Amino acid sequence: MTIFIDPATGYEVRVIRKPIRRIYLRVREGKSVEVTAPRKVSEREIRDSVAGKTAWLTKYMALVPEKIKFQYVTGEIHHVFGKAYPLQVLLGPRDEAGISSFGELQLVLRTKQSDREAIFKEGMKRILLLEIVQCFKKWTKRMAIPESWITGVTIRVMKSRWGSCRSVTGRFSFALDLVTKPKKCIEAVVVHELCHLFAAGHSADFYALMEKYLPDYKERGRLLSSLPRELV
């Protein structure tokens, strides 16, 4: 991936090369532009394409929310599985974050100097991983996927994707920000990635599988796309 600043608008432009035929532009949260381009297209062609869309970018940029910036302080609102929680920040014996037995979202700090953001995100990773593991158990059974096909699941910060599947190795990655989204959206992403074990790319066969296993996947996808990213 390469990054440059468009001189006409001042927007950050992220360029991702893929085996596609055309150049596509997308407006992302945080007032940035994502360009997916064919691998053989020159950087000059990409820059010219962005420059030719200045009016379009300016129009749609006004509709995109600013990137959410958290301070990780008591009372700040965070979402877990689509539900809003006021954060409680406490001092305790060890650094950790999660939902308490009383249903409260807590960030526990060993000292006031502890890295709040890192501790919070680590706690959210654990929460999301547990949910995704449950989804894998449910859907690998329904889709008759052998356990040996799944070799690893990781959670990481992903700015432009919700998940990825390496079908050859059986390794999956999911965006940490999914922890803020409703469970039905998380399930849709899991099924999406599992379908890639049977169909590479987004072919007609792939979408036939999605329709078979999750008939309302488009509705779930629209809901997911409508929600702002929080943990990126």
Sequence positions of predicted segments:
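Walker B catalytic acidic pair
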Residues: E193
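Active-site-proximal or metal-binding-adjacent scaffold patches in catalytic folds
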Residues: M1-A188, L197-V232
